[in-house]
């Protein structure tokens, strides 16, 4: 008989000033195929919280507008499906990265916002403009 392993994760009630836990684990792809996309370890949850506190909330305040996470945490399955890095593991799988979009002001580009973030004191280790077709977003990690 297989042993069942129970893991209890502590999810902070107030996950951030501008972001919710649910927004950071939501995956349209996971919903579409009917699988869960949730952290399995407390370390992943803690990393997501640190990402919000140290990067996402400060970026939201720096650019003074809503920031929409489109790909925060990714389970191993979702990461494989979307073509994320496996070796080394994607920072999304560790809870250390999020792909975000926001409304651009007139004359602004994702590149100019990325430069503004890099010049700030926000501790990002990656601030990358990514694009697919006409869509663009920022990959932010901590």
Residues covered by each model-derived region:
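Extracytoplasmic cell-surface/polysaccharide-interacting catalytic and binding patches
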Residues: 1-62, 133
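N-terminal start-of-chain detector that recognizes signal peptides
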Residues: 40, 69-74, 109-115
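Amphipathic alpha-helical interface surfaces
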Residues: 44, 51-55, 65, 78, ...
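Extended, low-complexity, intrinsically disordered C-terminal regulatory tails
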Residues: 53-84
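A broad, low-specificity signal marking well-ordered, structured residues that form hydrophobic/aromatic
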Residues: 67, 98, 137-138
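Short, surface-exposed glycine/acidic/tryptophan-bearing loops
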Residues: 76-98
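Catalytic cores and adjacent binding grooves of peptidoglycan-active enzymes
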Residues: 89-92, 102-142
